[in-house]
Swiss-Prot record:
Gene, per the UniProt record: cmk
The UniProt record lists the keyword Kinase: yes
Protein name in UniProt: Cytidylate kinase
Upper classification of the organism: Bacteria, Bacillati, Bacillota, Clostridia, Peptostreptococcales
Keywords: ATP-binding, Cytoplasm, Kinase, Nucleotide-binding, Transferase
UniProt organism field: Alkaliphilus oremlandii (strain OhILAs) (Clostridium oremlandii (strain OhILAs))
GO cellular component, one term: cytosol
Length: 217
């Protein structure tokens, strides 16, 4: 039996998680937010006051951490941390943790194991190129920096967090640079991925487009 695997890649704030989650609900398939796994590890790094440049200790932490998905909730060492991993500080630091080759190898292995034997939609930075290179459908979502910063601004404002939108733009550009320039599994479009620019589109517009593309595979 062949299982459906949908890979959604793209930069920070392009709408990957929101769209992937909606598609998972529509198709009744498992959703895996791989970015949440890197955020969970970053949360643990910061909680333990580990220097973000101390790669050796971060790798050891990754080797000794239990990061799990249960019913779309993210658990770190048995504790649900859905809200904790969405802080501004983690937004700024997660790319530094995610660029470490050994960390990516550990988490990619875990992601592939989760995908085995079931229909999945997975979003991240290197799903179509590295995690699920033989995915049924590969999508690369993008949007302007201004649009992505505005989305993040509104998301944080909804949670009662006041931020400067110009600072968010700078943070997004910095994350884009780190993600695309890292030596191992950088953020790049898979050759066979379909680009969708979500600037100005509603969530439902993008969801419908991807579901229609899947029907044509």
């Amino acid at each position: 039996m062949e299982f459906v695997q949908i890979a959604i890649d793209g930069p920070a704030g392009a709408g990957k998680s929101t769209i992937a989650k909606r598609i998972a609900e529509r198709l009744n398939i498992t959703y895996i937010d791989t970015g949440a796994m890197y955020r969970a590890l970053t949360y643990k790094v910061l909680a333990n006051n580990i220097d973000i440049t101390n790669e050796k200790t971060i790798i050891e932490l990754a080797q000794n951490s239990n990061i799990q998905f249960l019913q779309e909730n993210i658990y770190l060492d048995g504790k649900m941390i859905n809200e904790e991993i969405r802080s501004i500080e983690i937004n700024k630091k997660v790319s530094h943790v995610a660029k470490i080759k050994e960390v990516r190898e550990i988490l990619v292995d875990a992601q592939r194991k989760i995908a085995l034997g079931q229909d999945v939609i997975m979003d991240g930075r290197d799903i179509g190129t590295h995690v699920l290179p033989n995915a049924t459908l590969k999508i690369f979502l993008t949007a302007s920096v201004q649009e992505r910063a505005l989305r993040r601004y509104l998301e944080l404002k909804k949670k009662g967090i006041e931020v400067d939108i110009d600072e968010l733009e700078k943070d997004i550009m910095n994350r884009d640079n780190i993600d695309s320039q890292r030596a191992f599994a950088p953020l790049v479009k898979a050759q066979d991925a379909i680009i969708i620019d979500t600037t100005g589109l509603t969530i439902e517009d993008v969801v419908e487009r991807i579901i229609n593309l899947l029907k044509g595979v």
